[in-house]
């Protein structure tokens, strides 16, 4: 279908912005109507529009690993039902990690075909974290899972709504397979309603400009996306760039898992090859293929054109190679519920490979892990389940000319947030005893890494269960250009008897009233030789409590003396000259 006249570039841009706005309205509608704090506070969801072939044409800010998989999920719908098998008002659901829209079972994909003139012309798709969908542990995702069947119910692509009517059979199955069915069904209906918001917006756009003009504009701006990517790609240095890293272990305490990449940059292609990456793991850190492909997309965009509008055309120069039966491309029934513990490395190792080639676009390593947590149990006062799910923020790596950021969510989490103290204490039987910057020694450099966080949750219930998965607990964030490595992530249980347990993972650990779970996220890697950091900046760090006087002398070569503290310039010059 084509327009009857040439479309001017202004109309193309207006229609593109209108479609992006429709995706953003979908995102906001879901956040405002969901029942779970992991959606309305954390914003653990993503939304996008595709064309009738499943090509991504517009997205809202959200979790990067969600956006890239939604086109795959739409293509699964088309592959199963065909366009002729869809009716106006249908909404389809899938959460199967081994299908195209995969992450883990908690992340449900809902898809609505948008009809205009009696035909499906686009799709609205969203993915959101549902707090509990069954499985062996409350909250469903589990660091101790050994197969996918322990991680909750799985839906292949099925119709959740038939021509606008709820499929009661599917709804009943959902209600019987979760510990908090009213929360799950509330989130499901909010998600469905948000798709309808996007559909109405798209239909208004088609009414205003005409379907032919809208579809032709999409083709034009997809071509523009490819042209923009190629133009930026040609500014990058050609070559093959390699790196490798190690994931802490196989998810169950075994050996470290190798992650290897070779990035090939040419004038017309950006190839990410993960050949040499370690095998499928026993534990649940395996990443389904489509989420690794999505992570490769945002790593590619961050290097090629960070501020471009992402769409199928923009990503067309990217080619990703992922061998089968690896941690990045596992086989059913391998567990995947803490997939982020490997998937995050799919982006991180690309940045590490390119750090010297494009130093203005890459920072040192950051704390990397989602550092996901669940605090749950039967509320003593209400007699019902409570399940709090959230990520944790941490320290980012420094870049050339810029210190790292303090307390931001990891790269894979994108536009998400942690729970506020007020929401945590109001919604759940939790008291927040401490919420502070982690000033552990590490991440020093000419530009130091950003600080992680320390957060203490004291249990205000007779009993609670705590689950936590804090990857990068053995191998800290890497420094660049002479900067020092950062510090690892860690979780600790402090019991009322004075005992302390420190681990990278807890799985449904029983806590009693008064026990404290402490979440510690790492400091990012530093950039550049610490001995050339501006002495005044070092003094400021000392005054702020980020660097000790001893570390200022030993690491930065800055002598700080007196009360109030000041720089001894003569001794500083002597210290620094002895190093160089």
Indicate residue ranges for each PLM-predicted region.
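Glycine/proline-enriched, intrinsically flexible loops and inter-domain linkers
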Residues: 1-88, 93-580
């Amino acid at each position: 279908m084509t327009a009857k006249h040439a479309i001017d570039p202004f109309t193309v841009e207006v229609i593109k912005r209108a479609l992006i706005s429709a995706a953003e309205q979908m995102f906001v509608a879901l956040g405002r109507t969901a029942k779970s704090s992991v959606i309305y506070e954390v914003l653990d969801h993503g939304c996008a529009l595709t064309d009738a072939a499943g090509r991504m044409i517009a997205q809202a800010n959200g979790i990067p690993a969600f956006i890239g998989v939604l086109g795959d999920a739409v293509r699964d719908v088309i592959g199963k039902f065909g366009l002729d098998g869809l009716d106006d008002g249908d909404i389809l659901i899938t959460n199967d990690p081994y299908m195209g829209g995969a992450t883990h079972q908690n992340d449900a994909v809902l898809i609505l075909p948008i009809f205009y003139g009696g035909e499906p012309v686009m799709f609205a798709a969203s993915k959101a974290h549902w707090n509990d969908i069954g499985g062996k542990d409350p909250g469903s995702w589990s660091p101790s899972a050994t197969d996918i069947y322990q991680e909750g119910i799985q839906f292949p692509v099925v119709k959740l709504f038939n021509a606008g009517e709820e499929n009661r059979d599917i709804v009943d199955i959902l209600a019987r397979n979760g510990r908090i069915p009213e929360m799950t069904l509330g989130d499901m209906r909010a998600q469905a309603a948000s798709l309808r918001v996007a559909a109405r917006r798209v239909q208004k756009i088609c009414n205003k400009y005409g379907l032919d003009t809208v579809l032709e504009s999409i083709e034009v701006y997809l071509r523009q996306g490819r042209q923009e990517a190629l133009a930026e790609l040609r500014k990058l240095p050609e070559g093959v760039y390699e790196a490798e890293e190690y994931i802490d272990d196989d998810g169950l305490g075994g050996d470290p898992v190798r992650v290897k990449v070779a990035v090939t940059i040419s004038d017309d292609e950006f190839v990410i090859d993960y050949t040499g990456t370690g095998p499928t793991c026993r534990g649940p850190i395996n990443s389904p293929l489509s989420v690794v492909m999505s992570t490769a997309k945002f790593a590619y965009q961050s290097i090629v054109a960070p501020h471009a509008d992402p769409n199928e055309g923009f990503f067309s120069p990217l080619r990703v190679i992922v061998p089968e039966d690896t941690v990045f491309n596992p086989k059913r029934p391998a567990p995947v519920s803490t997939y982020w513990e490997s998937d995050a490395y799919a982006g991180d190792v690309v940045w590490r490979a390119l750090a010297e080639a494009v130093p203005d676009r890459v920072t040192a390593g950051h704390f990397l892990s989602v550092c996901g947590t669940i605090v749950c149990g039967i509320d003593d006062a209400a007699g019902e389940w409570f399940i709090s799910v959230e990520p944790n923020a941490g320290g980012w790596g420094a870049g050339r000319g810029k210190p790292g950021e303090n307390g931001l969510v990891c790269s894979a989490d994108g536009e998400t947030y942690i729970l506020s103290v007020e929401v945590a204490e109001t919604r759940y039987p939790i008291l927040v005893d401490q919420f502070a910057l982690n000033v552990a020694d590490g991440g020093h450099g000419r530009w130091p890494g950003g600080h992680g966080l320390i957060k203490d949750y004291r249990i205000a219930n007779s009993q609670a269960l705590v689950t936590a998965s804090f990857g990068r607990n053995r191998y800290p964030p890497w420094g660049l250009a002479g900067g020092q490595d950062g510090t690892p992530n860690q979780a600790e249980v402090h019991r009322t008897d004075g005992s302390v347990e420190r681990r990278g993972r807890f799985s449904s650990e029983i806590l009693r009233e008064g026990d404290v779970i402490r979440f510690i996220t790492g400091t990012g890697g530093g950039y550049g030789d610490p001995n050339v950091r501006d002495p005044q900046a070092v003094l400021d760090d000392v005054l702020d409590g980020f660097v000790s006087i001893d570390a200022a002398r030993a690491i930065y070569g800055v002598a700080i003396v007196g009360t109030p503290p000041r720089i001894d310039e003569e001794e500083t010059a002597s210290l620094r000259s002895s190093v160089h």
